């Protein structure tokens, strides 16, 4: 492996693909349909023609052409966007350089064609022929790893019926449920029975080799020793652990007297407010005792967040019990100042790119800006909650009839519940922004290195990630059935959704603007939105996460291993490219290492952290091209 040469445009000895004038190919996608556990459950294939040609527009250009109006569902459309974006990165071409088109027949939908669509688009960009006897199923993650899907036995049988000889499926899914019988089926044994060779796919490279017979360059992973945390970085992390612990303890010192003054029934009735504190303390203490310093920092931050939310919630209830609804509302109003603070920080980070003008400095600024964008997104979700509370209380009636009194009581209860749901979101926003400040204060943007950043490259990436973020948001909403009307409520329960939705909006607002500051904000917001949506899609759809438990456990184990390998390879490329391995990337990787053997929630966070390691390293390479 020779690494990447910025001046000659060669990566690992393979010439960078050129933008094609026009290339197209037809592939057969697999699907399943019918009601599970009935004879209607069956699989099949559907042809689609994919085309790649030079883009003459200034922005991204991805289209789906239908045989019938409405014949292609939202999931399928979003899959095409994400596949085009991912394939462009692997081909080392700007997402904006090509126009991508998919022509479908009949009625198709579903999210499981991500890997096949990506591999096919990549083959068109590289000029490699697609083998007609091959098909596959599986989602694709931003780091190029595959995600599990359902209905694999039915899809395999459908592929065999159409004469396919090779069938790829996601790693960890060899034992898959037959949707007709409910029995667990060995996919490889079923393939042998049907005369189809089955291939377990871990990454896009596996899928590409199966689809084209051509191997992609596989980059050597960095040595693990290079990813160890330096002693000085470890010491600064311990300082931040102490800071978060002190913040949490100070907050609880304010909460405890309020609880002590209550009678036991009242304390018991409010346990839903205080129990998150004790659960978070237990996790933070365990991480610290195990020497998991980075995880301990994050978990003590969770304690501080839970404590602040509890303090605010108790203040809201106290004001409401005194009949002072305005005071209850005003408990949360000071948090709105975070918006201006976050925007000022984003401006400073954007200006730092123009000053330093090198790939490592730019990546550090973008990563720091992502944390600020996360805080800004949470403030946006909180503002939505407060606006709903105001709208509710404005509906109070002046009539004194029993019916009006009952209706008013319901509105007051709804008003208070909105405030109580908003309190944790705004507390998290404050903690997230504080964490971003700490990161910058402890030298999180000081490292420099690599080639100069071209302004047009920064602008192109900002537009690309804004488009990818929008596609990812729509994709997730479609596969879980999240309506726009329920989006705000879901953000209260799942902070990543606030980041995904508000990050997408912020990226769209800034993507077309001129100036380094605006481009850094757009890139950071788009990347944060895209990565958050992808993490949610993997969590709730691919891994079937429900009530704190993951259903597809073998796939989770396989994903963790694949994401880890991908992160190490990306870090190795970055070091060879710039001669620098930013401490931020090292920290993110080690955070994943500390979490990967923890609870299911920890494992989900570990996957996200490995993914962010890959993203940061790949972004540096993209900026340096």
Language-model features, listed with the residues they occupy:
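Bacterial N-terminal signal peptides
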Residues: 1-9
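C-terminal amphipathic alpha-helix
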Residues: 303, 307-310, 314-334, 370-543, ...
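Short helix-adjacent coil turns
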Residues: 279, 284-298, 363, 370, ...
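Acidic, serine/threonine/proline-rich low-complexity intrinsically disordered regions
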Residues: 540-552
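Peripheral, non-AAA+ core regions of ATP-driven protein-machinery
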Residues: 18-282, 313, 322, 326-376, ...
């Amino acid at each position: 492996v020779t690494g990447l040469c910025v001046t000659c445009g060669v990566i690992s000895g393979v010439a960078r693909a050129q933008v094609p004038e026009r290339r197209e190919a037809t592939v057969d996608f697999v699907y399943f349909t019918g009601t599970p556990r009935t004879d209607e459950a069956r699989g099949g294939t559907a042809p689609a023609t994919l085309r790649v040609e030079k883009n003459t527009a200034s922005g991204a250009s991805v289209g789906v052409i239908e045989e019938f109006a409405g014949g292609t569902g939202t999931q399928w459309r979003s899959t095409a966007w994400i596949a085009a974006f991912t394939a462009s990165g692997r081909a080392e071409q700007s997402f904006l350089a090509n126009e991508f088109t998919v022509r479908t027949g009949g009625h198709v939908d579903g999210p499981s064609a991500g890997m096949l669509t990506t591999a096919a688009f990549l083959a068109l960009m590289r000029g490699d022929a697609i083998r007609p006897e091959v098909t596959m199923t599986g989602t694709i993650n931003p780091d190029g790893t595959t995600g599990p899907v359902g209905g694999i036995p039915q899809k395999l049988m459908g592929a065999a019926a159409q004469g396919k000889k090779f069938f790829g499926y996601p790693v960890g899914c060899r034992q898959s449920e037959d949707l007709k019988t409910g029995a667990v089926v060995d996919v490889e044994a079923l393939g042998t029975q049907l005369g189809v060779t089955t291939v377990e796919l871990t990454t896009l490279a596996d899928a590409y080799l199966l689809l084209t017979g051509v191997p992609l360059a596989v980059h050597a992973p960095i040595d693990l020793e290079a990813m160890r945390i330096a002693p000085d970085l470890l010491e600064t992390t311990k300082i931040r652990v102490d800071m978060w612990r002190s913040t949490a303890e100070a907050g609880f010192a304010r909460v405890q007297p309020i609880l002590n003054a209550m009678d036991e029934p009242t304390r018991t009735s409010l346990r839903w407010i205080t129990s998150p504190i004790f659960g978070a303390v237990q996790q933070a203490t365990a991480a610290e005792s195990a020497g998991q310093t980075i995880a301990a920092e994050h978990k003590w931050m969770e304690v501080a967040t839970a404590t602040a939310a509890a303090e605010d919630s108790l203040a809201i209830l106290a004001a409401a019990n005194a009949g002072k609804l305005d005071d209850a509302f005003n408990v949360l109003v000071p948090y709105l100042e975070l918006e201006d603070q976050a925007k000022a920080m984003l401006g400073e980070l954007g200006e730092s790119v123009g000053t330093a003008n090198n790939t490592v400095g730019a990546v550090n600024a973008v990563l720091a800006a992502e944390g600020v964008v996360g805080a800004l997104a949470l403030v946006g979700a909180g503002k939505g909650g407060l606006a709903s509370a105001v709208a509710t209380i404005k509906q109070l009636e002046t009539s004194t009839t029993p019916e009006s009194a009952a209706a008013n009581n319901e509105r007051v209860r709804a008003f208070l519940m909105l405030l109580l749901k908003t309190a944790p979101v705004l507390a998290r926003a404050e903690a997230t922004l504080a964490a971003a400040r700490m990161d910058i204060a402890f030298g999180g943007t000081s490292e420099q290195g690599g080639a100069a950043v071209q302004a047009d490259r920064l602008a192109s990436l900002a537009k690309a990630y804004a488009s990818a973020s929008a596609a990812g948001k729509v994709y997730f909403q479609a596969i879980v059935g999240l309506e726009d009307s329920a989006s705000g409520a879901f953000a209260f329960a799942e902070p990543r959704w606030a980041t995904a939705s508000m990050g997408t909006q912020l990226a769209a607002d800034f993507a077309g603007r001129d100036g380094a500051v605006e481009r850094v904000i757009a890139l950071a917001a788009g990347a944060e939105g895209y990565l958050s949506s992808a993490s949610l899609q993997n969590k709730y759809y691919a891994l079937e996460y429900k009530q704190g438990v993951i259903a597809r456990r073998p796939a989770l184990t396989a994903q963790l291993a694949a994401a880890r390998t991908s992160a190490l390879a990306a870090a190795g490329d970055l070091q060879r490219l710039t001669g620098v391995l930013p401490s931020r990337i090292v920290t993110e990787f080690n955070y994943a290492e500390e979490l990967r053997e923890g609870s299911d929630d920890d494992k989900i966070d570990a996957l996200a952290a490995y993914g962010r390691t890959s993203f940061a390293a790949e972004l540096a390479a993209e900026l340096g091209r």
